[in-house]
Amino acid sequence: YIENNYSINSENVNIVSMRKGLMNGSYTYFNEAFKLIMNTSPNDADFSDLVHSKINIDNFFDYFIIQTYIQNGDWFAGRNNTKIWQAESSKWNYVLYDTDQSYSSNFDSINAISFARSPYKLSAEGDTIDYSSRNSKLFNHILNNNQLKCFFINRYTELINTIFHPSFFKEKLDSIKFKIEPIITDHFLRFPLDNFSYDDWIKNLDDYIQLNNE
């Protein structure tokens, strides 16, 4: 993915999974960047510049925006399906993947942004258990900076009014749904979910678009 999209040799890339740890290269650079950001107060005058120097902030915010907007149920634990990469001496970038559990009604009553900042799960007894990770801690810490928080809000608003706008979203869905029907059907055969079908999937997306339109 990185070689094909960024023309960077994989031997020169550090890849870290929030769940599995180091996947390629060295863990040192991520540890250093994470500790430096987390040990710096968001109120520090140089905090925003520090974050910009270590993280591709456009990629960072777009990643969290799309994950929270589509309510990815296979990501919300704060640890799952999260990978970041960095070419040597460059900024860290997030990779968006495994989003097939998105647009779930199970998350309709949850503030997705708050959940991403402070993820939790419920015990068998119904008690709330902290499920934060480096991923969620970093996101929360960065949003505690007013300048970066405003940047995030403005970017979220921009995307909601453009590519996430219901009319645009519906147009794109209608343009591809028949092309990808064989792939989606095969996906549900390989990973069955309570007899969930292609038609159910389309209806789920249509309902979600309508809900956002309201």
Regions picked out by a protein language model, each given a short descriptive name:
Residues 21, 26-214:
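Middle-to-C-terminal accessory/interaction subdomains
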Residues 1-24, 28:
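Conserved ATP-binding subdomain of kinase catalytic cores across diverse folds
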